[in-house]
Amino acid sequence: MILLDGKALSEKIKAEVKLEVEEIVKEKEITPGLAVILVGNDPASATYVASKAKSCENAGIYSVVHKMPETITQEELLQTIAMMNKNPKLDGILVQLPLPKQIDTTVVLEAIDPLKDVDGFHPYNVGRMVSNLDAFLPATPFGVMRMFEEYGIELSGKNVVVIGSSDIVGKPMASLLINAKATVTVCNSRTKDLKAHTLAADIVVIAVGVPFLLKEDMVKDGAIVIDVGINRLDTGKLVGDADFEGLKNKCSFLTPVPGGVGPMTIAMLLKNTIKASKLREKRENRC
């Protein structure tokens, strides 16, 4: 079994990003900039945002974290996004999810300039992604695709099962796999006989937030398993949606948790921010 080491690959990508930033600063005399909006005091979100800011700093990307109270109104949040859209020094804008219940997440995501939408959640970018056109791709599925590429995993003609149909991972993951000419089945909580689907799969991508859902007897010998899930047990241990110990002697490729897909998400966010910085001139020249 080959371990898909997302931590090592993410460090490689971050080093590439740092070089790209240096080139942009030298050639265009601009510093790529990213704004992160954090609403409320959720500890997990705060930790994740801090990690994003640190990664930006290490890569030479200017970043600002805009903290807003849990009680903020939707109008106040939209006004903040509007200001960021107009700020030429900010190439990327992302809103840390989830948002409080008084906020309509769809309206907020649609308010972000599509050319600054480094999370790839704006309908403009989602549509372009589905149509296999150039777009900002959601960072986690983007990271998984980069992992396939790095390890020489062929997707064309392969049977791939995606377990989970979220807007953040499942749906975009399926779209990217379809564009890569894979035969894709998407399973959700209503799927009957999940095991029958996974046993027929060459590759399984799981992202549901249920510890150890995918077990050894659910995949065929030599299957590839990409575990996007991250769950904290009562013991404090972090585990994935797949039973790593049970699967490690049956799979040909397997991602660990932690250290698999997780580190790739921030690395690909940095890649998207660099992409956005290269669109700065295009944004400024719009009517």
From Swiss-Prot:
CDD domains: NAD_bind_m-THF_DH_Cyclohyd (cd01080). GO terms for biological process: L-histidine biosynthetic process; methionine biosynthetic process; purine nucleotide biosynthetic process; tetrahydrofolate interconversion. Gene3D superfamilies: Leucine Dehydrogenase, chain A, domain 1, NAD(P)-binding Rossmann-like Domain. Pfam families: THF_DHG_CYH, THF_DHG_CYH_C. Keywords: Amino-acid biosynthesis, Histidine biosynthesis, Hydrolase, Methionine biosynthesis, Multifunctional enzyme, NADP, One-carbon metabolism, Oxidoreductase, Purine biosynthesis. The keyword Ligase does not apply. This is Bifunctional protein FolD. Belongs to the tetrahydrofolate dehydrogenase/cyclohydrolase family. The gene is folD. It comes from Aliarcobacter butzleri (strain RM4018).
